[in-house]
Amino acid sequence: MRAVVQRVKEASVTVAGDIKGKIDKGLLVFVGIGEGDTEEDVRYLVDKIVNLRIFEDDTHKMNLSALDLNREILAVSQFTLYGDCRKGRRPNFTGAAKPRYAEKMYDTFVKFLKNTGLKVEEGVFQAMMEVNLINDGPVTILLDSNKQF
């Protein structure tokens, strides 16, 4: 399971002109489900995301987490995080989980995020979405439950 985590001042996701999720200060999380990902991968990523110390303390040092500050999270599914571009010029997405399984794992991911007590908004699985954001920093972190990066 992979995630791109961005610290944002605000973010929203729109589908067919309707805002489906909107947050103020917090984290925008693009999440991709890989073939073979399990609930253990979900637990690992959720714990890592909500506890990442990427918010500044009073001394301007990145020392606080979303949990510490009760920040909001906008979760957006994105299978393209499994795009393999090592051969040719067109990404190969065979590493991404099949849609039915990926949706189940994505729903579990969102449920576990909500269980942390933080406000969690989300996009629409498999929809064409417009994501708007104002980066804060910018701060962007790549995570992989298989620790490939």
From Swiss-Prot:
GO terms for biological process: D-amino acid catabolic process. GO terms for molecular function: D-tyrosyl-tRNA(Tyr) deacylase activity; Gly-tRNA(Ala) deacylase activity; Ser(Gly)-tRNA(Ala) hydrolase activity; tRNA binding. A motif (Gly-cisPro motif, important for rejection of L-amino acids) lies at residues 137-138. It is an enzyme of class 3 (hydrolase). Gene3D superfamilies: D-tyrosyl-tRNA(Tyr) deacylase. It holds the Pfam family Tyr_Deacylase. It comes from the Bacteria. Homodimer. Belongs to the DTD family. A Gly-cisPro motif from one monomer fits into the active site of the other monomer to allow specific chiral rejection of L-amino acids. This is D-aminoacyl-tRNA deacylase. The lineage of its organism: Bacteria, Bacillati, Bacillota, Clostridia, Halanaerobiales.
